Regions:
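Intrinsic disorder at enzyme termini
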Residues: 1-9
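A non-catalytic, amphipathic alpha-helix used as a structural packing/dimerization or gating element
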Residues: 9-23
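Glycine-rich flavin
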Residues: 19, 25-166
Length: 166
């Protein structure tokens, strides 16, 4: 894609997201930033617009759009509220896109519709004290137990979007 000559679909997406961002994201940005709050209902509204699963296949509730479309949404959100844009990025790319590419078929069918709609919010626990975000150096392990639950051993510095969902 020639970024200086976007497709009609990309142009329409940019206009839609820019208009929505200016009307709904920008007016709340300063207040939410100063009060260290997050506008979860606003993020969920993006699910109704088809943006939370922008790169996920349509069969799982996503929009099935390309990387350029993802970049357009991130760019437009970042212009008004970088913190909100980061939460969107963590949800849509670190969680949804990762699951769409690497998840099992069962996981995709069970989880993707919920995160694409905004009913669930995706998170990512990657950073560790000894290696930062070097994914090849991560030491945390997850082992499924006999009862079907998972035992997780390791240390994380934070979980991006971990405190957003109810």
């Amino acid at each position: 894609m020639d970024i200086s000559n976007p497709s009609e679909e990309h142009t329409m997406l940019r206009e839609m997201v820019r208009d929505w961002t200016q009307e709904f994201v920008e007016p709340q940005a300063l207040e939410y930033d100063r009060e260290e709050k997050f506008n979860l209902p606003l993020l969920r509204e993006m699910g109704e617009m088809g943006l939370l699963g922008i790169s996920a296949p349509e069969q799982y509730g996503g929009a099935g759009l390309d990387a350029t479309a993802c970049a357009i949404v991130h760019e437009e959100l970042s212009a008004s509220d970088p913190g909100f844009a980061l939460a969107y990025l963590a949800h849509s790319m670190l969680f949804v896109n990762n699951l769409a590419i690497n998840g099992t078929e069962e996981q995709k069918k069970r989880i993707l519709p919920l995160v694409c709609s905004g009913e669930w919010i995706g998170a990512m626990a990657m950073s560790e004290p000894d290696v930062g975000t070097d994914v090849l150096g991560l030491s945390t392990t997850a082992v499924q137990q006999d009862d079907g639950t998972w035992k997780i051993n390791g240390r994380k510095m934070w979980i991006t979007n971990g405190c957003l969902d109810e």
